[in-house]
């Protein structure tokens, strides 16, 4: 995969909403669970981190009503993840990929093994270089090239100093990760912050997906490049995965949502109903792409004139599988699903929080049709207590 307290946001989202006079969809909120403020990953492939932390912020607020606002530090997680990924890349002689992207599991792994910290205990994104948002244009390519040179070296023995060099590059950009910090008058380590303040248990979180090339109700390593830690997902039939998503939100939960956003129906800047994702029942000529950097222009969604909540395809398990098998469904982007709304025709949509800043007519929030979610969801990470009991029993969780 290449984030106002919700009480304020919900007051806006709960009203029927029309982006502007040319748009045809009007949304009314059915339920909007608490989320934190919209963030901006800017020019970086860190959606996996922003979306996972957005999800964990909601989790912490749900578990601890005294927490009224929360902003977890992306730089801490990315710092820890990139050095681990560099190590894996070198150990596999470059066969395990190294890129800006990542998976939800990277954040769960970081929480379990290194902890988490609140924003403000490391330099804010890119402030060390005179900016206020991530911009990996100058930072990442030299580091990537250095790691590749080590991993693909024909030397019989490599100098272990390479790892200190890479950690230095990472620290120079993000700042060093603190061993202790003060928050709301108390001293924490990253690990005690998770346990004592956030009160989150990494073992509560599971990844769910739906594909037929592995048995249902088993777990498997989802075969995507950014799953470099080889995290496992539980495999459900499509109707049960959709039931988990729907019932979780209606019962007060949110979840991290990984999906393909390269579809023409994922409407961005132009045309009707921008920031709405649908599966229009028409032939698509969308190009392949991923994440914000390729979608801030007018190409994506420009040809859509039927994203009006009607005429969507009926999604089957076979369609999902075909998209995955032939690469038309790709691991593009991580987001957070937090609510359900309906349009003026009574059709339901998931409400999604993005990490592209206050972008579009809904200021960083999107509406995702259920057919789109059924078709293009790669996986979700969710609190296992949000999964219906009968499905948990089938999965053994």
Predicted regions and their residues:
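Short, glycine/serine-rich, charged loops/turns that create anion-binding
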Residues: 11, 54, 261-262
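Active-site nucleophile-adjacent alpha helix/oxyanion-hole segment immediately C-terminal to the catalytic cysteine
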Residues: 22-256, 360-362
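Active-site signature of cysteine proteases
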Residues: 164-397
């Amino acid at each position: 995969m290449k984030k106002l307290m919700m009480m304020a946001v919900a007051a806006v989202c709960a009203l029927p909403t029309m982006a502007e006079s040319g748009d045809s969809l009007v949304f009314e909120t059915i339920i909007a669970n608490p989320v934190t403020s919209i963030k901006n990953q800017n020019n970086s492939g860190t959606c996996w981190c922003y979306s996972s932390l957005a999800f964990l912020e909601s989790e912490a607020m749900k578990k601890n009503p005294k927490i009224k606002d929360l902003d977890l530090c992306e730089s801490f997680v990315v710092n820890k993840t990139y050095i681990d990924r560099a190590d894996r890349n070198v150990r596999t002689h470059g066969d395990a990929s190294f890129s800006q992207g990542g998976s939800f599991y990277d954040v769960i792994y970081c929480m379990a093994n290194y902890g988490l910290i609140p924003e403000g205990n490391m330099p804010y994104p890119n402030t060390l270089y005179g900016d206020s948002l991530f911009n990996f244009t100058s930072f990442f390519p030299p580091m990537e090239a250095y790691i590749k040179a080590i991993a693909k070296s024909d030397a019989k023995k490599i100098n272990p100093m390479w790892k200190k060099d890479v950690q230095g590059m990472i620290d120079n950009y993000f700042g060093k990760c603190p061993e202790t910090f003060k928050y709301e008058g108390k001293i924490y380590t990253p690990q005690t912050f998770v346990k004592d303040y956030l009160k989150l248990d990494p073992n509560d979180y599971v990844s769910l997906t739906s594909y037929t090339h592995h048995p249902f109700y088993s777990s498997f390593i989802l075969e995507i490049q950014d799953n470099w830690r080889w995290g496992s997902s539980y495999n459900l039939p499509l109707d049960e995965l959709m039931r988990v998503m729907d019932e979780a939100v209606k019962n007060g939960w949110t979840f991290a949502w990984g999906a393909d956003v390269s579809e023409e129906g994922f409407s961005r800047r132009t045309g009707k109903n921008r920031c709405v994702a649908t599966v229009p029942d028409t032939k698509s000529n969308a190009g392949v792409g991923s994440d914000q950097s390729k979608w801030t222009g007018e190409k994506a969604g420009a040809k859509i004139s039927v994203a009006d909540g009607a005429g969507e395809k009926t999604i089957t398990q076979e369609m999902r599988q075909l998209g995955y098998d032939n690469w038309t469904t790709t691991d593009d982007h991580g987001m957070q699903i937090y609510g359900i709304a309906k349009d003026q025709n009574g059709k339901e949509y998931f409400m999604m929080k993005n990490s592209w800043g206050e972008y579009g007519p809904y200021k960083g929030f999107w509406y995702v049709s259920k057919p789109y979610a059924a078709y293009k969801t790669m996986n979700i990470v969710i609190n296992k207590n949000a999964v219906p009991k009968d499905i948990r029993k089938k999965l053994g969780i």
